[in-house]
């Protein structure tokens, strides 16, 4: 059976009080609507149509070709929004799910179960519901004496007795696609909001003797909609708990989950330890037996087995096995550290390749460079890579020793087994097995201060 999805993403989100389009506000480093799209695609649908309105181009820019789009010029209600997908879906057979773009916590597993329940019951429509303690603002599930769905009533149209019901509609539905578009043309806007409500389609189906099912989820967090910054914060916290819980169940030690933020696309190997205050985002891959020290930040990077990152920032970089970074080091984009490398305190590495066993232990800047195997870079060494217009490369061979407070003025190549004396400013290439000294000879005037 063919399956389709409609994501409702046309709302202005005035309560967010933001210039940014509502569904593009981020949860766990990713726009809300992107979380929804990934869950929808993961549920196995064949085609997705996203309904966009204000800020349409920005949504398209994020989702790209993963979705088709329909434009809703006026926001006249959820039924009106779904009807905008008519040109893409009206003649399709199969099941269509409707999901709100501001429900970033919905999972593909719940959508798969909703679709299966809907199709197994041979229903024309199925609503995803939940029972919550504070149902204010949600449509209520009104059941008849036999427990079947009678209707869904919106908050502003509900009687007091209906407002006391704590089973609510999530705003997520599964429909027989043909039935959906047939009934949408019959929906009226005679309600307190003057809008065309999608739940009215369910009433029309029931009035014709059709089958409408309710599938209740026990995970209330999944259906949480985000309408303001407070709810955005709640969604962020919920996603954080979910992600950390997943990693801990898969063998990762997280010392303080409440202060640890791990993005949804991060992978972490077993027996890795994450200390308090850590942030790991983007498409970061962390191996086994790694230690990420407190207050470190890692983005879009690869950390191999046995490495240790202490109170450092790592962006778009790679760290080899058993390598030690920090404390207070910064790996900028393009930093590539081999195995058993040491990058110590107050060292900055940018677009540089440090081969296995290389050491840069203190107070150095290494940029646009290659440092050979087992080479030691002394405290205060600087690669002078920029002339105000262009960047130039520094190459240091293997098994070399660069003393403290050395300037390597690029472009320059230092060979293998070279000793560069402390305090030197090196402007010329140095061949293998050499000593390079480039500093003024010391003059001492005895008795000068008497």
Swiss-Prot record:
Residues 1-229 are annotated as: Pyrophosphorylase. The active site is at 362 (proton acceptor). The keyword Oxidoreductase does not apply. It holds the Pfam family Hexapep. It catalyses: alpha-D-glucosamine 1-phosphate + acetyl-CoA = N-acetyl-alpha-D-glucosamine 1-phosphate + CoA + H(+); N-acetyl-alpha-D-glucosamine 1-phosphate + UTP + H(+) = UDP-N-acetyl-alpha-D-glucosamine + diphosphate. Mg(2+) binds at residues 102, 227. Its EC number is 2.7.7.23, 2.3.1.157. Pathway: Nucleotide-sugar biosynthesis; UDP-N-acetyl-alpha-D-glucosamine biosynthesis; N-acetyl-alpha-D-glucosamine 1-phosphate from alpha-D-glucosamine 6-phosphate (route II): step 2/2; Nucleotide-sugar biosynthesis; UDP-N-acetyl-alpha-D-glucosamine biosynthesis; UDP-N-acetyl-alpha-D-glucosamine from N-acetyl-alpha-D-glucosamine 1-phosphate: step 1/1; Bacterial outer membrane biogenesis; LPS lipid A biosynthesis. It is an enzyme of class 2 (transferase). UDP-N-acetyl-alpha-D-glucosamine binds at residues 8-11, 22, 72, 77-78, 139, 154, 227, 332, 350, 365, 376. Binds 1 Mg(2+) ion per subunit. InterPro entries: Bifunctional_GlmU (IPR005882), GlmU-like (IPR050065), GlmU_C_LbH (IPR038009), Hexapep (IPR001451), Hexapep_transf_CS (IPR018357), NTP_transferase_dom (IPR005835), Nucleotide-diphossugar_trans (IPR029044), Trimer_LpxA-like_sf (IPR011004). One of its GO terms (cellular component) is cytoplasm. Residues 251-450 are annotated as: N-acetyltransferase. One of its GO terms (biological process) is lipid A biosynthetic process. Its cofactor is Mg(2+). Its main location: cytoplasm. Acetyl-CoA binds at residues 385-386, 422, 439. Keywords: Acyltransferase, Cell shape, Cell wall biogenesis/degradation, Cytoplasm, Magnesium, Metal-binding, Multifunctional enzyme, Nucleotidyltransferase, Peptidoglycan synthesis, Repeat, Transferase. Residues 230-250 are annotated as: Linker. It is found in: Cytoplasm. One of its GO terms (molecular function) is UDP-N-acetylglucosamine diphosphorylase activity. In the N-terminal section; belongs to the N-acetylglucosamine-1-phosphate uridyltransferase family. In the C-terminal section; belongs to the transferase hexapeptide repeat family. Catalyzes the last two sequential reactions in the de novo biosynthetic pathway for UDP-N-acetylglucosamine (UDP-GlcNAc). The C-terminal domain catalyzes the transfer of acetyl group from acetyl coenzyme A to glucosamine-1-phosphate (GlcN-1-P) to produce N-acetylglucosamine-1-phosphate (GlcNAc-1-P), which is converted into UDP-GlcNAc by the transfer of uridine 5-monophosphate (from uridine 5-triphosphate), a reaction catalyzed by the N-terminal domain. This is Bifunctional protein GlmU.
């Amino acid at each position: 059976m063919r399956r389709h999805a409609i994501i409702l993403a046309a709302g202005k989100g005035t309560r967010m009080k933001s210039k940014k389009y509502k569904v593009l506000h981020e949860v766990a480093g990713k726009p809300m609507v992107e979380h929804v799209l990934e869950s929808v695609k993961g549920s196995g649908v064949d085609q997705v149509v996203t309904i966009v309105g204000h800020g349409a181009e920005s949504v398209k820019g994020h989702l790209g070709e993963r979705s088709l789009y329909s434009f809703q010029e006026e926001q006249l209600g959820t039924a009106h929004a779904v009807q905008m997908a008519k040109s893409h879906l009206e003649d399709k057979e199969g099941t269509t799910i409707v999901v709100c773009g501001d429900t970033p916590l919905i999972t593909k597993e719940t959508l798969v179960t909703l679709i299966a329940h809907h199709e197994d019951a041979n229903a024309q429509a199925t609503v995803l519901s939940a029972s919550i303690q504070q149902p204010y603002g949600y449509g209520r599930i009104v059941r008849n004496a036999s427990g079947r769905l009678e209707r869904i009533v919106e908050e502003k149209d509900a009687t007091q007795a209906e407002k006391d019901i704590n089973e609510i509609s999530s705003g997520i539905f599964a429909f027989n696609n043909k039935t959906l578009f047939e009934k949408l043309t019959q929906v009226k806007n005679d309600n307190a909001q003057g809008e065309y409500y999608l739940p009215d389609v369910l009433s029309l189906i029931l009035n014709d003797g059709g089958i409408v099912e309710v599938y209740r989820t026990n995970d209330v967090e999944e259906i949480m909609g985000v309408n303001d910054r407070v709810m955005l914060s709640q969604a962020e916290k919920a996603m954080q708990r979910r992600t950390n819980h997943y990693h801990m169940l898969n063998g990762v030690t997280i010392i303080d989950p409440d202060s640890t933020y791990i993005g949804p696309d991060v992978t972490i190997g077993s027996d890795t330890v994450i200390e308090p205050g850590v942030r790991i985002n983007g498409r970061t891959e962390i191996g086994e037996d790694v230690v990420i020290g407190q207050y470190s930040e890692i983005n879009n990077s690869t950390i191999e087995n046995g490495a240790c990152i202490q109170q450092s920032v790592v962006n778009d970089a790679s760290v080899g096995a058993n390598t030690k970074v920090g404390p207070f080091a910064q790996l900028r984009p393009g930093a590539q550290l081999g195995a058993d490398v040491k990058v110590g305190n107050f060292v900055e590495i940018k677009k540089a390749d440090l081969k296995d066993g290389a050491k840069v232990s203190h107070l150095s800047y290494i940029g646009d460079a290659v440092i050979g195997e087992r080479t030691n870079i002394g405290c205060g060494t600087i690669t002078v890579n920029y002339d105000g217009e262009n960047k130039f490369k520094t190459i240091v061979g293997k098994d070399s020793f660069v003393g403290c407070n050395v300037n390597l003025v690029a472009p320059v190549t230092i060979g293998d087994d070279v000793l560069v004396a402390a305090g030197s400013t090196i402007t010329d290439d140095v061949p293998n097995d050499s000593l390079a000294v480039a500093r003024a000879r010391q003059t001492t005037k005895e008795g000068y201060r008497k």
